[in-house]
Amino acid sequence: MIKLDWNEYLEKAAEVNAEGAVLLVNNGVLPLDKNAVTQVFGRIQLDYYKSGTGSGGMVNVAKVTGITDGLIEAGAKLNEDVLKAYKDYVAEHPYDYGEGWGGEPWCQEEMPLDDSLVKRAAESSDTAICIIGRTAGEEQDNSCKAGSYLLTDGEKAILRKVRDNFSKMVILLNVGNIIDMGFIDEFSPDAVMYVWQGGMTGGTGTARVLLGEVSPCGKLPDTIAYDITDYPSDKNFHNRDVDIYAEDIFVGYRYFDTFAKDRVRFPFGYGLSYTQFEISAEGRKTDDGVVITAKVKNIGSAAGKEVVQVYLEAPNCKLGKAARVLCGFEKTKVLAPNEEQTLTIEVTERDIASYDDSGITGNAFAWVEEAGEYTFYAGSDVRSAKECFAFTLDSTKVIEQLEQALAPVTPFKRMVRTAEGLSYEDTPLSKVDEAARRLGYLPAETAYTGDKGIALSDVAHGKNTLDEFIAQLDDNDLNCLVRGEGMCSPKVTPGTAAAFGGVAKHLEELGIPAGCCSDGPSGMRLDVGTKAFSLPNGTLIAATFNKSLITELFTYLGLEMRANKVDCLLGPGMNIHRHPLNGRNFEYFSEDPFLTGTMAAAELEGLHSVGVEGTIKHFCANNQETNRHFIDSVASERALREIYLKGFEIAVRKSKARSVMTTYGKVNGLWTAGSFDLNTMILRKQWGFDGFTMTDWWANINDRGCAPDKNNFAAMVRAQNDVYMVCADGESGSDNVIAALADGRLTRAELQRSARNILSFMMSTHAMARKLGEDEAVEVINKPAETVDDGEGDRVFLLDGDLTIDMSGVKTERNLDYSFTVDVAQFGQYRMEMTASSTQSELAQMPVTVFSMGTAWGTFTWNGTGGKPVTFAVEEMPMFSRYTIFRLHFGLGGLDMDKIVFKKIRPAEAQVCRLRISERWLQTQTYFWLKANFQSKKLLRGRRAYR
């Protein structure tokens, strides 16, 4: 029996929270005096954003420690009058969940500050903290508007009153990624710190930094410019149909430190400490790279950690280069004053090389080191790094010769650095015949033998080969094997994203287990309401620059996955922070691909150490949420290789990633779910990947030049994208696999190839070990007792037309959840009615929030009804997922539930039924449908009626 100590898990996450906090301004106000009274302003002190929105943040937790909670638990003295005022305000203005999936507001309504309250508070101390909160996420990019990237008038009013009344003002940013920092010029705060979104322990780690228990040691994973228009991608970001990556390799600091140094407010890698460090470094050339040795000494008066960052300046020859490129980093231990530590940073030739996508160096489609001087810089950020080593290469060296792959087909001009400065040039276009390339790599078919009585366990135990097992599978078996089943498949852990592998009866009879996927990367999403651990977001993790610490944290997550029988976490997210307004930046790490790949590799090493897997996503160039199902990301092969694929390559080569998810959209004209160049040529042939790949949930697939089709599994399998996520039932579907086998568009050998990828992976999972009775259980200890919904996995109701569910006797205690599953026989639009009564006073308020598949559809508040039944309704609720999980969250007790009624308003359109489109697609379409048809919240408020 393996034990997972919940207290150790909490402590490790709090360590990450503290190390990821990035202090940008400090005029001597931090750390706070623990014995002095501190005022905290901003409602987010009571509504802490633990993560962004969408699948990457939907982790159900028993407790979230916000910033105020963390300060109080650490023994800080807060102004009770100010805290009470905010508690009263939040009680009257509860958290706004918005209009369902993709419709959450970016921020919460702020409390207007009463002048007398502020003046009284200022009499008790001279220090005030102001907390600004932001969220965004799946289907919802940020916007350069007040309440998102910019501050609201209400927030500015708070900052103005605090600035006018307090001599020391601290601003904390509880955000998923960077926001506009113009408030520094307007309000001159004495301290500013990004504390990001820290998961369920965010306030604990933040308090440790504020109170000086931990010296801040986080570093910016992104460049903060003066204006949003300073970012070179801004001209094309948010285009709905085609996004031209005209800035090419010049993303983030690569652009600013090459062309626009004066437009940087805070440079990449920057972050202050409560102490000071002295860094001295030197380097030496090796056969396969460079080794930098850096000595770090704490020359200040407080203990702390420092990050040594190594940057390369490559010769700007035929291939235009960025002025600086991060190629290595290490973090010290905690150094006491006058203590020093020596760090060794190894830089490989692959980290030094550039990709020639045109042949301008004489080496087309190769990683090369051009002749010239290579200079290395070491320091605490990209700007302060000092030269520490240089070497000269006499002639151009080919590091790796490849074949052209994934190059653009659409002509465009790309940014380039010449001897004269910034210029633009024609981008090299694809010369590849994709159809011919695929035929050139067709695998050999294994002859069909029929059932020989070989079970997958026989392969696992070495009695038979995998090819002998696969030879038994007929076309239908192979077809079922490339289907994932979900969401919330009953074959795996309740409330998870998908089952894969043994999703059909005959596959199960052959001994193939059903593997389980759960949404990530901020922890496990369990839509039945099961509580899990919510981790710090990706941006915060990157800001730690601490590889070993992140590996330790994800080892705990891996054990939690095992305890919940989850085999694959759908994360880490690895897309690049190409633009600050991308809604899912909170899930991703950085604008830099080396930092991205290195931190993802650290996460994977933690998961792998306990035998579970992380699915690296979204492969690749998923850099905006606007129209993400159809957007065409048009980028040069060089930009893809050096920026947008680089992090994935590091994760595959360094940590042997074995699970990959493609995107919803297109890259250079082809939906990634069916891209042979991406899934076979680059991932497998060039990088050596030996795992399995999956689509994103209900993704489009196409053949070059053809319309997208969610049923085109043939194109998916030809590309060697192995599993379609997801189908309502693994036994059947409306895909085109059998038809494509019949007419020759798909070969049986290609289906067998995907089967081999899937089954090879399955045999390495704990799902297989469980099926063989060989798995070691994980026991979670020291997890606080919580009110649980004991029957959550057993309540399944068939919805075939209308349905009435008896709710009498259901407990409605404060913060209790009640979950049930509806097996939807007929997809369509339904009215959901909830009837309840209460003998509480007429002024009593008993809120109930309705969640469907983890998404809040609305909050309905009953007052005392004198014992009479009162009905609220969601007037129209689209239901397109066969197993739809509902969760009711009771804010307070005192409510007597009567019944829930589902009434079908109209069936789904025939095309929708044929495609068996399910929850995540539905949520996307529902959001836009709501926006188009209802400008108010009338639909979600429902209707109240006495009977």
From Swiss-Prot:
Keywords: Carbohydrate metabolism, Cellulose degradation, Glycosidase, Hydrolase, Polysaccharide degradation. The active site is at D696. It is an enzyme of class 3 (hydrolase). The keyword Iron does not apply. Its EC number is 3.2.1.21. Gene3D superfamilies: Glycoside hydrolase family 3 C-terminal domain, Glycoside hydrolase, family 3, N-terminal domain, Immunoglobulins. Pathway: Glycan metabolism; cellulose degradation. The keyword Hydrolase applies. It holds the Pfam family Fn3-like. It catalyses: Hydrolysis of terminal, non-reducing beta-D-glucosyl residues with release of beta-D-glucose. InterPro entries: Cellulose_deg_GH3, Fn3-like, Glyco_hydro_3_AS, Glyco_hydro_3_C, Glyco_hydro_3_C_sf, Glyco_hydro_3_N, Glyco_hydro_3_N_sf, Glycoside_hydrolase_SF. One of its GO terms (molecular function) is beta-glucosidase activity. GO terms for biological process: cellulose catabolic process. Belongs to the glycosyl hydrolase 3 family. This is Beta-glucosidase. The lineage of its organism: Bacteria, Bacillati, Bacillota, Clostridia, Eubacteriales.
